[in-house]
Amino acid sequence: MAKEKFDRSLPHVNVGTIGHVDHGKTTLTAALTRVCSEVFGSARVDFDKIDSAPEEKARGITINTAHVEYNSLTRHYAHVDCPGHADYVKNMITGAAQMDGAILVCSAADGPMPQTREHILLSRQVGVPYIVVFLNKADLVDDAELLELVEMEVRDLLSTYDFPGDDTPIIIGSARMALEGKDDNEMGTTAVRKLVETLDSYIPEPVRLTDKPFLMPIEDVFSISGRGTVVTGRVERGIVKVQDPLEIVGLRDTTVTTCTGVEMFRKLLDEGRAGENCGVLLRGTKRDDVERGQVLVKPGTVKPHTQFEAEIYVLSKEEGGRHTPFFKGYRPQFYFRTTDVTGSCELPEGVEMVMPGDNVKVSVTLIKPIAMEDGLRFAIREGGRTVGAGVVAKIIA
């Protein structure tokens, strides 16, 4: 079968299921594709196919992730589901599958469990902006008061981690019933349809990359005689046009320059857009004033920083990571976008050491400033070998 053309007419939103092991994340994922295929005509994906998720690599780390898609009336959803807890941690920290919103699946029969809490905390740390709750397995709970109790517990937990617990939509249902095409007490297909409608209404349409302020990590710098200095890279977001004022941020003092030309595949263009690899010609900037690892940005939008809090995942020995734990004062290289910068780690109070395979919050101090914002991803390296991954949770200085 020929690949279907990607439908650009519907706005595109990235979501994913999070929650404790065996609370029904994968069943709900399969049920979503089934219900949407029947109601809105998107393709159906079976449980087994989602459960045997293929491996993929992100920032040197292997992660198992299943990707499915489905449509509502007004949107196209790309949905990620991970088989194991470690895969979630890695996925969220590396940003392999960035989410515009998450569906927290919690078993009504068991209530919130340790991974329920951990996934909410991770969502907060890595900047997942919206969470919608699906209280699953409600067909196994006869007591309405018990359902209410679990709902209150989930709301409290969300509020603990600065999500709006009282206003978070909670849908009660049974993913298994929906997957089997049943709908007793409107707990099956109706509940899943309601979930899709809630995703439509509660998760706002994400700002398109081209509408965000311009940012391009600098990969290479060339000097072209008679024309000046050209920096090349892939535009991460926004648009750069000829004559735009720009700033060069990171590693040294911020400098101001102007775009005098944009090139792609040796052709001159009027502008460079998000996702494109291009060269930007800079007025009055010398070849030695710029280096790989800096970023080219719209003036005033990004600042350089050296101190931040981060959520990190440390690779296990089996994943090619360290064989031994590290302690406070650990000094690896932090790889941001296109370059390594050395930094030292402070551990949270009461944490003596960090073992391979752990995820932990650390405070980092870099020896040189890097252009950064909350949510920026990085790799942790020792002599060019990836030993971990992280995300900036909060900038300190």
Curated annotation (Swiss-Prot):
Q: Where in the cell is it found?
A: Cytoplasm
**Any keyword Cytoplasm?**
yes
Q: Which GO terms describe its cellular component?
A: cytosol
Q: Name one GO molecular function term.
A: GTP binding
UniProt EC number: 3.6.5.3
Where is region (G5) located?
Answer: 174-176
Residue span, tr-type G domain: 10-207
Residue segments, region G2: 60-64
Listed A to Z, the keywords are: Cytoplasm, Elongation factor, GTP-binding, Hydrolase, Magnesium, Metal-binding, Nucleotide-binding, Protein biosynthesis
Q: What is its main location?
A: cytoplasm
Catalytic reaction equation(s): GTP + H2O = GDP + phosphate + H(+)
Q: Which residues bind GTP?
A: 19-26, 81-85, 136-139
**Region G1: what ranges?**
19-26
Location of the region described as G4 in the Swiss-Prot/TrEMBL record? 136-139
Q: Which PANTHER family match?
A: ELONGATION FACTOR TU, MITOCHONDRIAL, ELONGATION FACTOR TU-RELATED
Instruction: Say which family it is in.
Output: Belongs to the TRAFAC class translation factor GTPase superfamily. Classic translation factor GTPase family. EF-Tu/EF-1A subfamily.
Protein name, per record: Elongation factor Tu
Provide the species name: Pseudomonas savastanoi pv. phaseolicola (strain 1448A / Race 6) (Pseudomonas syringae pv. phaseolicola (strain 1448A / Race 6))
